[in-house]
Amino acid sequence: MAKGGAKQRTKKKKAAPEKAAIHIHSTFNNTIVTLTDTEGRPIIWSSGGNVGFKGAKKGTPFSAQMASDKVAKEALNLGVKRVDVYVKGPGSGRESAIRALQAAGLNVESIKDVTPIPHNGCRPKKKRF
């Protein structure tokens, strides 16, 4: 028999610093936006699928804008004012995600492209026609 006095644990909201980093990982299929502290520990995240888009619609600039807007609003509620933005990947949601962060009221101090570029590493896939 189950005990009646079991307590449910509620997840505590992490106290965010005034300055944080936002990582935007943009692929052709989706865009993932993550708010981290300055050491890189994640605080909040969102993606195209997380805000309600399915399938090919997750890779659109509009879904990236919605995901960024959600993260920016949560960040402002936690007290984050200044952010550094790190963008990775070739997807279509890069620019619209950055614009959404600025429009939401966050002070974007720097934007860095951290897309990994091979120095002639692995052989790429064959071309698709």
UniProtKB/Swiss-Prot annotation:
Keyword RNA-binding: yes
GO CC annotations, alphabetized: ribonucleoprotein complex; ribosome
Biased composition (Basic residues): 1-14
Annotated segments matching region Disordered: 1-20
Single GO MF annotation: structural constituent of ribosome
Domain of life, source organism: Bacteria
UniProt feature coiled coil, ranges: none
Assigned keywords, A-Z: Ribonucleoprotein, Ribosomal protein, RNA-binding, rRNA-binding
A Gene Ontology BP annotation from the UniProt entry: translation
SUPFAM superfamilies given in the database record: Translational machinery components
UniProt xrefs under NCBIfam families: PRK05309.1 (NF003698), uS11_bact (TIGR03632)
Family membership noted in the UniProt record: Belongs to the universal ribosomal protein uS11 family.
Summary of subunit composition and partner proteins: Part of the 30S ribosomal subunit. Interacts with proteins S7 and S18. Binds to IF-3.
The protein's role, per its UniProt record: Located on the platform of the 30S subunit, it bridges several disparate RNA helices of the 16S rRNA. Forms part of the Shine-Dalgarno cleft in the 70S ribosome.
UniProt cross-references to HAMAP family, sorted A to Z: Ribosomal_uS11
Name of this chain's protein: Small ribosomal subunit protein uS11
Organism for this UniProt entry: Petrotoga mobilis (strain DSM 10674 / SJ95)
Taxonomic placement: Bacteria, Thermotogati, Thermotogota, Thermotogae, Petrotogales
